[in-house]
Amino acid sequence: MRRYVENVPPSLTQKELHDRAYALLYRVLKDEWGIASPVVEKTPLGKPYLKGENMPHISLSHTKGIVCCAVSRKNVGIDAEYPRRVRGSAAERVCTPAELRDIQSSPNPAARFLTYWTLKESISKCRGTGLSESFQNYEITFENGMPHLNGYTLFFEQYGVHFLAAAEEA
């Protein structure tokens, strides 16, 4: 899996962020994958994919200040989040009991929740289910500080103030 991130002005609208994320993807596909004229389509649940035979899998995300994409020969998902206030009830709707305990015991519960959120969103994008599947259906653990979920290779980092996560089928 290759991940690509680009800083953008924080004042961009959602449409401008969307367009910049796709511009990044098209540039990456041309320059690094040799795909000059990609045709992007979407599944019924909204997962973007490249039309054609033997095309790589793609995922895109954007948030205030950055756009990103992931490209892989396997199913892939990427998510970026700008830090924001989160209600406690959001964690209860998204996380398993073990994940909630981890969040509550963290020195920075808001940051820990956003870590789980971006990881779970990247997994749902990888699966192609988006928000149609309950995030409580799977539990992320951390082994030696690295996120883990059977069947997936997970990546997480704080990119400046942003939370960035990616998932790829193992």
Question: Model-predicted segments: where are they?
Answer:
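Core catalytic alpha/beta fold that binds nucleotide/phospho-ligands
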Residues: 1-170
